[in-house]
Amino acid sequence: MSFETISVIGLGYIGLPTAAVFASKGKKVVGVDINAHAVDTINRGAIHIVEPDLDRVVQAAVERGDLRATTQPEAADAFLIAVPTPFMAERQPDLRFVRAAALSIAPVLKKGDLVILESTSPVGSTEQMADWLAAARPDLRFPQHDGDPDVFVAYCPERVLPGQIMTELISNDRVIGGMTPACSARASDLYRIFLQGECVETNARTAEMCKLTENSFRDVNIAFANELSLICAAQQINVWELIALANRHPQIGRAHV
């Protein structure tokens, strides 16, 4: 089954570039956001966020009629959810936006559709999302209950750096975590529409943990570099020279201090 129409739920720093890249490949893309100002801005061929090269891709896609935005989900062949997952006051992950997005698309789901969660989420979130969808649509079979589902579900985290998103979306490898191997294969087919990197397939829980591991590795490196700067300041050592020298070690240079 081909992907004639793709819906992206959440038109922020990940959702809008993703929608624009799919549209640049000639796919009909419907972006959905509760922010009416963002929707109106995009439909004028402009952008409401700052990201190099995004403006021209969005403008061209809107002018061709391949990209449009709305505040309400519509029927599509694939749905990508890219909404915020902030922390609550007690530092617990807040999945209310994911739940709201899932419930918003549930009425328009049909047999053969693909639903992908891209938001950074705790392990088990994709399964939870699938449960919300199944509860809302008992007439459809989902992968947690049936080996031959009507709706395919996967977790495919973004792996891009702000300021380089339009390049890295296309060139970086993509972790594809389906709830079943068939879900992974279906999600890989979707991303291959624009992806030049490799689709690396795994299960949803491993993909969720992979994204958290990548973020944690970055955070640990930042904290380590900060500690080095404090020590170097106390010892009258140039921290940048130190880092450049340390990165010449073959085992350290691979990770980059």
Question: What residue spans do the PLM features occupy?
Answer:
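Structural/interface elements that position substrates and couple domains in central-metabolism enzymes
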Residues: M1-R254
